[in-house]
Amino acid sequence: MTRRDLAKLAAGSALAPQIRLPGAAAYTGALDGAESKVDLKSFDPVLFSRRLYQAAPLRLTFGAQNRKQAEAWQKKLRAKVLELLGPFPASSPVLNSQTLEVRDFPGYRREKFIFESSPGLNVLGYLLTPKNATPPYAAVVSVPGHGRGVDDIIGVDEYGRDRTDKDGYQHDFAVQVTEHGMAAVAIEPIAFGCRRDPLTKKRGLKQSACQPVAGAALLLGQTMIGWRVHDVMRTIDWIGTRKELDPARVGCMGISGGGTCTLFSAALEPRIRAAMVSGYLCTFKDSVFSLSHCIDNYVPGILNWAEMYDVAGLIAPRPLLAESGEKDNIFPIEASKTSFARVKKVYEVFGMGERAAHETFNDAHSFYGKAGLPFLKRHLAG
């Protein structure tokens, strides 16, 4: 072997990938081996964003001392939240509602329907009316979280079969509404279930279309939350067309992403008489700000003006019950308790502290309803 061959061999070995022996530490990236020479915290984007949070002005956070001041605060913050959500889609001049199917079950009747929320945009929903009550019924707009969409809350399994075991983390809570003598108006949120694009539908029932749709909304200066709130408002319009439902006794409830929709809808829509938020009330800081969440949760610039507890405070003095799992790993329980304490202060300034409640339970991110459903029934009573 010539000197030139030896030189080539040496050069090749120097350029070859370094093989780590069994038991050796895994390669950690470009700073591997240089950790002691740098401040690792200065490379952490979450720590960077948390420092920015500390400087967030929260210009419209609650600080009122009496009801008059609280009402003035609500007016300002409600207008700002509407602005931040972006303009709502245009409402169709008529709902063009259509019944697709009616089925009878032992404890309730279920009607599948559609209506036009915005020109060219339909909403699918299910009206579940109880057999243990007399019309006109209180109506609870019921919004599912991420999963298979509205099927997850009306008693339909992943094969399209009826079920009675209340499976999944959402436990068919729309069916549970009827068991408490109220009607459930369960809607399919945009980008969930049947309201997904064809490409996303090919990926399976559990794959939401929040990406790219929520991103598209942001590029348009709008938000997925705004679109979903608008659908809730139009659902309440639809409720007003049904003689078996009482439009003066409308509630709203949802879990997770449905809890997001419920909180913002109740904050902005005065026709919602009572609300139940499951698996969502927390702080932005400790949930969607710090943990990996779906893009449908984000409202650009909101931390310049308010925290989540401030938005929830816009519901006051209308009744609000929040529930939180003590093992919830995406909406941490301690932050949920902190947030509710701030919401409670708003209700107390209104002189209605008893109308705000928080139930915690020994489980993960899931629907519970032990206190929440009786709470809605009590506050939506005729």
List PLM regions with ranges.
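Non-catalytic accessory segments flanking enzyme active sites
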Residues: 50-128
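Proline/glycine-enriched tight loop/beta-turn segments at coil->beta junctions
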Residues: 121-122, 131-139
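Cap/lid segment of the alpha/beta-hydrolase catalytic domain
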Residues: 143-230, 287-291
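Mobile cap/lid helix-loop segments that gate and shape the active-site cleft of serine hydrolases
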Residues: 212, 216-220, 230, 234-235, ...
